[in-house]
Amino acid sequence: TGAQSLSIVAPLDVLRQRLMNELNRRRMRELQGSRIQQNRQLLTSI
């Protein structure tokens, strides 16, 4: 039973890590996107 529970837990940990990585990537992309938009607004307002 120990081996079975381990085989179930390991993939879950991998999935969780992938989810966290994906969320972080999206967050960084959104931050960069908003920064670019702010720069564009600054350029157009000048």
Swiss-Prot record:
Keywords: Amidation, Hormone, Secreted. The keyword Secreted applies. GO terms for cellular component: extracellular region. The keyword Heme does not apply. Pfam families: CRF. InterPro entries: Corticotropin-releasing_fac_CS, CRF. The modification Isoleucine amide is found at I46. PROSITE patterns: CRF. GO terms for molecular function: hormone activity. SMART domains: CRF (SM00039). It is found in: Secreted. Regulation of fluid secretion. Stimulates primary urine secretion by Malpighian tubules and causes a dose-dependent stimulation of cAMP levels in the tubules. Belongs to the sauvagine/corticotropin-releasing factor/urotensin I family. This is Diuretic hormone. It comes from Acheta domesticus (House cricket).
